[in-house]
Amino acid sequence: MIADAADSARLSQLPLAEFIFGSTSGMHEVRKILEGALEDDLPVLIEGESGTGKEVVARYLHVHSERAGGPFVRVNCGAISSRLLDGEMFGQDSAASGSVVLAANGTLFLDEIAEMDSALQHKVAHALKTGQVRNGSSVNARIVCATSVDLTGAVSGASPGLSSHFEHRVRLLPLRERKQDIPQLCEYLVEKFARNFGRTAPRLKPQVLDAFQQWNWPGNIRELENWIARIVIFGTEETMGNEFRRQTAGREGVAMARHHALRLNAGRMRRTRRQV
């Protein structure tokens, strides 16, 4: 998947302080790491739960790099079987170009790298370490990887030492760990969707913001985006605010339990896929 030109143009105009904002110490650390990643061409590992914005960060690194004129090629490692993924990345044979070749002079974004089997992870680790692929040719692309699990954790299924090959490693915080940033995020998202949909930007009432800050957002920023988009599109903040409170009332524990269950199930699926 190659980045949309409109998205790239929009991201290229944003300074880092406006792209990654927030007052928590964790967000300050994110900005610090990304500042370093913007100064070189070395591999980057982006960690974070689903919905925290890993791909957007990868795209931001691309459009603010010297490779911005090249392609941004995304490979969803969790959507393809390991056998097909090998060919997708490195080519079926010498005559077939894989994603590594297609990303030449640009950025190769490997999403959910922990979904790969160990053999393919070793190939990626080799490329990260030596800058070459199995046929001896050079990798002429910046490699940015993302994962929703801790690569050093026992349930990740990642090859030992894989994470050590990344010069830059950044963890995007789940929204529940940066609730004080929610009002600022809401303001940004309201303006964004109002501009995209040609609507007047509503001013969110304190009651709505309070309700947003009390919720733990298992879907993270993506879930918040969905609610803000609905408020902007339908133009009924009070109605949507009441709907939000109705849907989330008493569901905090259920939502978080479901979130953790899904993560555990994903780990089991990875182990099963390797055994097949």
Description of each model-found segment:
Residues G69-P71, S164, R178-D181:
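Short acidic capping loops at alpha-helix termini that bridge into adjacent secondary structure
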Residues M1, V44, G53-K54, R59, ...:
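Bacterial C-terminal helix-turn-helix
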Residues M1, A103, I113, V133, ...:
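Generic low-polarity alpha-helical segments
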Residues A5-S138, R142-A154, L175, A194-E237:
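AAA+ ATPase active-site-proximal loops
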Residues S8, S12, E18-G22, E29, ...:
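Bacterial helix-turn-helix/winged-helix DNA-binding modules and their immediately adjacent linkers
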Residues H62, F90, A125, S163, ...:
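Conserved protein kinase catalytic domain
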Residues A158-L175:
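A short helix-turn-beta junction within AAA+ P-loop NTPase domains corresponding to the substrate/partner-engaging
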Residues A95-G98, G161, Y188:
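A general alpha-helical scaffold signature found inside nucleotide-binding enzyme cores
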